Curated annotation (Swiss-Prot):
<dbReference type="Pfam" id="PF02545">
    <property type="entry name" value="Maf"/>
</dbReference>
<keyword id="KW-0963">Cytoplasm</keyword>
<feature type="site" description="Important for substrate specificity">
    <location>
        <position position="164"/>
    </location>
</feature>
<dbReference type="InterPro" id="IPR029001">
    <property type="entry name" value="ITPase-like_fam"/>
</dbReference>
<dbReference type="InterPro" id="IPR003697">
    <property type="entry name" value="Maf-like"/>
</dbReference>
<comment type="function">
    <text>Nucleoside triphosphate pyrophosphatase that hydrolyzes 7-methyl-GTP (m(7)GTP). May have a dual role in cell division arrest and in preventing the incorporation of modified nucleotides into cellular nucleic acids.</text>
</comment>
<keyword id="KW-0378">Hydrolase</keyword>
<feature type="active site" description="Proton acceptor">
    <location>
        <position position="79"/>
    </location>
</feature>
<dbReference type="GO" id="GO:0005737">
    <property type="term" value="C:cytoplasm"/>
</dbReference>
<dbReference type="GO" id="GO:0047429">
    <property type="term" value="F:nucleoside triphosphate diphosphatase activity"/>
</dbReference>
<feature type="site" description="Important for substrate specificity">
    <location>
        <position position="80"/>
    </location>
</feature>
<keyword id="KW-0546">Nucleotide metabolism</keyword>
<dbReference type="GO" id="GO:0009117">
    <property type="term" value="P:nucleotide metabolic process"/>
</dbReference>
<feature type="site" description="Important for substrate specificity">
    <location>
        <position position="14"/>
    </location>
</feature>
<comment type="similarity">
    <text>Belongs to the Maf family. YceF subfamily.</text>
</comment>
<protein>
    <recommendedName>
        <fullName>7-methyl-GTP pyrophosphatase</fullName>
        <ecNumber>3.6.1.-</ecNumber>
    </recommendedName>
</protein>
Protein backbone atom coordinates (compact mmCIF):
# COMPACT_ATOMS: atom_id res chain seq x y z
CA UNK A 1 0.00 0.00 0.00
CA UNK A 2 0.97 3.65 -0.24
CA UNK A 3 0.46 6.53 2.16
CA UNK A 4 -0.01 8.92 -0.76
CA UNK A 5 -3.42 9.59 -2.32
CA UNK A 6 -4.08 7.63 -5.50
CA UNK A 7 -5.57 8.82 -8.78
CA UNK A 8 -6.79 6.33 -11.37
CA UNK A 9 -6.51 8.02 -14.75
CA UNK A 10 -9.43 6.14 -16.25
CA UNK A 11 -13.21 6.06 -16.36
CA UNK A 12 -13.25 2.26 -16.85
CA UNK A 13 -15.55 0.50 -14.39
CA UNK A 14 -13.40 -2.62 -14.71
CA UNK A 15 -10.15 -0.85 -13.79
CA UNK A 16 -11.92 0.81 -10.87
CA UNK A 17 -13.11 -2.58 -9.64
CA UNK A 18 -9.60 -4.07 -9.86
CA UNK A 19 -8.21 -1.26 -7.65
CA UNK A 20 -11.12 -1.57 -5.20
CA UNK A 21 -10.53 -5.33 -4.97
CA UNK A 22 -6.84 -4.63 -4.28
CA UNK A 23 -7.89 -2.54 -1.27
CA UNK A 24 -6.92 0.89 -2.56
CA UNK A 25 -8.82 4.11 -1.91
CA UNK A 26 -8.59 6.44 -4.90
CA UNK A 27 -10.25 9.08 -7.02
CA UNK A 28 -10.70 8.89 -10.77
CA UNK A 29 -9.90 11.38 -13.51
CA UNK A 30 -10.61 10.81 -17.19
CA UNK A 31 -7.69 11.74 -19.49
CA UNK A 32 -9.96 12.57 -22.48
CA UNK A 33 -7.30 12.11 -25.16
CA UNK A 34 -7.73 11.12 -28.80
CA UNK A 35 -6.37 7.57 -28.62
CA UNK A 36 -6.93 7.03 -32.35
CA UNK A 37 -4.36 9.77 -33.06
CA UNK A 38 -1.67 7.51 -31.56
CA UNK A 39 -0.76 4.58 -33.80
CA UNK A 40 1.83 1.80 -33.79
CA UNK A 41 1.77 -1.72 -35.21
CA UNK A 42 3.34 -3.23 -32.08
CA UNK A 43 0.74 -3.77 -29.31
CA UNK A 44 3.21 -3.20 -26.46
CA UNK A 45 4.51 0.03 -28.00
CA UNK A 46 0.98 1.21 -28.84
CA UNK A 47 -0.37 0.67 -25.32
CA UNK A 48 2.70 2.28 -23.75
CA UNK A 49 2.39 5.34 -26.01
CA UNK A 50 -1.31 5.74 -25.18
CA UNK A 51 -0.74 5.20 -21.44
CA UNK A 52 2.03 7.83 -21.47
CA UNK A 53 -0.21 10.27 -23.37
CA UNK A 54 -2.99 9.77 -20.80
CA UNK A 55 -0.52 10.41 -17.97
CA UNK A 56 0.88 13.55 -19.63
CA UNK A 57 -2.61 14.96 -20.27
CA UNK A 58 -3.60 14.47 -16.63
CA UNK A 59 -0.26 15.73 -15.29
CA UNK A 60 -0.76 18.97 -17.20
CA UNK A 61 -4.29 19.32 -15.81
CA UNK A 62 -3.18 18.58 -12.24
CA UNK A 63 -0.22 20.99 -12.37
CA UNK A 64 -2.53 23.76 -13.60
CA UNK A 65 -5.11 23.09 -10.88
CA UNK A 66 -5.29 24.43 -7.33
CA UNK A 67 -5.74 20.99 -5.77
CA UNK A 68 -2.70 20.52 -3.52
CA UNK A 69 -3.71 16.95 -2.61
CA UNK A 70 -3.68 15.92 -6.29
CA UNK A 71 -0.15 17.34 -6.57
CA UNK A 72 1.01 14.93 -3.83
CA UNK A 73 -0.71 11.91 -5.40
CA UNK A 74 0.36 8.82 -7.26
CA UNK A 75 -1.39 8.48 -10.62
CA UNK A 76 -2.08 5.27 -12.53
CA UNK A 77 -2.84 5.27 -16.26
CA UNK A 78 -3.19 2.22 -18.47
CA UNK A 79 -4.20 1.13 -21.92
CA UNK A 80 -5.25 -2.22 -23.33
CA UNK A 81 -5.56 -3.81 -26.72
CA UNK A 82 -6.58 -7.33 -27.62
CA UNK A 83 -4.45 -9.20 -30.14
CA UNK A 84 -6.33 -11.85 -32.11
CA UNK A 85 -4.35 -14.04 -34.49
CA UNK A 86 -1.68 -11.32 -34.74
CA UNK A 87 -4.12 -8.45 -35.36
CA UNK A 88 -4.58 -5.60 -32.85
CA UNK A 89 -8.17 -4.99 -31.75
CA UNK A 90 -9.31 -1.93 -29.86
CA UNK A 91 -12.92 -1.09 -28.93
CA UNK A 92 -15.35 -2.19 -31.66
CA UNK A 93 -16.58 0.70 -33.80
CA UNK A 94 -19.87 -0.93 -34.80
CA UNK A 95 -22.17 -3.67 -33.50
CA UNK A 96 -21.33 -5.74 -36.58
CA UNK A 97 -17.61 -5.48 -35.85
CA UNK A 98 -18.28 -6.51 -32.24
CA UNK A 99 -20.28 -9.50 -33.48
CA UNK A 100 -17.41 -10.55 -35.78
CA UNK A 101 -14.93 -10.21 -32.91
CA UNK A 102 -17.03 -12.39 -30.59
CA UNK A 103 -17.63 -15.04 -33.27
CA UNK A 104 -13.88 -15.30 -33.96
CA UNK A 105 -12.67 -16.13 -30.44
CA UNK A 106 -13.50 -19.84 -30.73
CA UNK A 107 -10.78 -20.11 -33.41
CA UNK A 108 -7.99 -18.07 -31.80
CA UNK A 109 -7.65 -16.84 -28.19
CA UNK A 110 -7.88 -13.21 -27.12
CA UNK A 111 -4.47 -11.97 -26.01
CA UNK A 112 -4.73 -8.91 -23.75
CA UNK A 113 -1.75 -6.57 -23.89
CA UNK A 114 -1.92 -3.96 -21.13
CA UNK A 115 0.59 -1.23 -20.38
CA UNK A 116 0.58 0.70 -17.12
CA UNK A 117 2.26 4.03 -16.35
CA UNK A 118 2.50 5.11 -12.71
CA UNK A 119 3.59 8.63 -11.75
CA UNK A 120 4.57 10.12 -8.41
CA UNK A 121 3.27 13.60 -9.18
CA UNK A 122 5.24 15.31 -6.41
CA UNK A 123 8.66 13.77 -7.19
CA UNK A 124 8.12 13.40 -10.93
CA UNK A 125 9.21 9.75 -10.86
CA UNK A 126 7.58 7.72 -13.65
CA UNK A 127 7.65 3.93 -14.01
CA UNK A 128 5.95 1.73 -16.55
CA UNK A 129 5.46 -1.85 -17.60
CA UNK A 130 3.42 -4.19 -19.76
CA UNK A 131 1.61 -7.42 -18.94
CA UNK A 132 0.03 -10.03 -21.19
CA UNK A 133 -2.74 -12.55 -20.54
CA UNK A 134 -4.42 -14.99 -22.92
CA UNK A 135 -8.08 -16.00 -22.67
CA UNK A 136 -9.32 -19.04 -24.59
CA UNK A 137 -13.01 -19.34 -25.50
CA UNK A 138 -15.32 -22.03 -26.77
CA UNK A 139 -17.96 -21.18 -29.39
CA UNK A 140 -20.12 -18.27 -28.24
CA UNK A 141 -23.75 -18.70 -29.28
CA UNK A 142 -25.36 -16.14 -31.58
CA UNK A 143 -28.15 -15.65 -29.02
CA UNK A 144 -25.64 -14.78 -26.34
CA UNK A 145 -23.75 -12.45 -28.68
CA UNK A 146 -27.04 -10.62 -29.40
CA UNK A 147 -27.65 -10.30 -25.66
CA UNK A 148 -24.12 -8.97 -24.98
CA UNK A 149 -24.34 -6.38 -27.73
CA UNK A 150 -27.79 -5.28 -26.55
CA UNK A 151 -26.45 -4.80 -23.00
CA UNK A 152 -23.81 -2.51 -24.48
CA UNK A 153 -20.81 -3.04 -22.17
CA UNK A 154 -18.84 -4.97 -24.80
CA UNK A 155 -18.91 -1.95 -27.11
CA UNK A 156 -16.68 -0.10 -24.63
CA UNK A 157 -14.10 -2.87 -24.24
CA UNK A 158 -10.97 -3.62 -26.24
CA UNK A 159 -11.70 -6.66 -28.35
CA UNK A 160 -15.44 -6.39 -27.75
CA UNK A 161 -15.77 -8.73 -24.79
CA UNK A 162 -16.03 -8.75 -20.99
CA UNK A 163 -14.95 -11.95 -19.23
CA UNK A 164 -17.25 -11.43 -16.26
CA UNK A 165 -20.31 -11.67 -18.55
CA UNK A 166 -18.94 -14.63 -20.51
CA UNK A 167 -18.06 -17.23 -17.85
CA UNK A 168 -20.10 -19.92 -19.63
CA UNK A 169 -17.91 -19.58 -22.71
CA UNK A 170 -14.43 -19.17 -21.21
CA UNK A 171 -11.84 -21.93 -21.26
CA UNK A 172 -8.22 -21.70 -20.12
CA UNK A 173 -6.77 -18.39 -18.89
CA UNK A 174 -3.02 -17.86 -19.09
CA UNK A 175 -2.06 -14.94 -16.84
CA UNK A 176 -4.08 -12.70 -14.52
CA UNK A 177 -7.78 -12.10 -14.99
CA UNK A 178 -7.08 -8.47 -13.95
CA UNK A 179 -4.95 -8.09 -17.10
CA UNK A 180 -7.97 -9.18 -19.16
CA UNK A 181 -9.98 -6.56 -17.21
CA UNK A 182 -7.47 -3.83 -18.17
CA UNK A 183 -5.31 -3.34 -15.04
CA UNK A 184 -2.75 -6.05 -14.20
CA UNK A 185 -2.77 -6.56 -10.43
CA UNK A 186 0.83 -7.66 -9.78
CA UNK A 187 2.38 -5.16 -12.19
CA UNK A 188 0.31 -2.24 -10.87
CA UNK A 189 1.16 -3.08 -7.25
CA UNK A 190 4.88 -3.29 -8.09
CA UNK A 191 4.86 0.01 -10.00
CA UNK A 192 3.05 1.81 -7.15
CA UNK A 193 5.66 0.43 -4.75
CA UNK A 194 8.51 1.67 -6.98
CA UNK A 195 7.28 5.29 -7.10
CA UNK A 196 6.37 5.30 -3.39
CA UNK A 197 10.02 4.91 -2.30
Amino acid sequence: MTSRPLILGSSSIWRKQVLIDMGYIFKTMSPDIDEKAIRDSDPKTLTLLISRAKAQALLKRIKESDDELDKKSIMICSDQVIVHNGVIREKPETEQQCREYLQSYEFHPAVAVVSVVVVNIETGKIVEGTDIATQHFKKISDEFIDKLIKQGDVMHCAGGFTVEHMADFTLQLEGEVETILGLPKTLTKNLISQVSQ
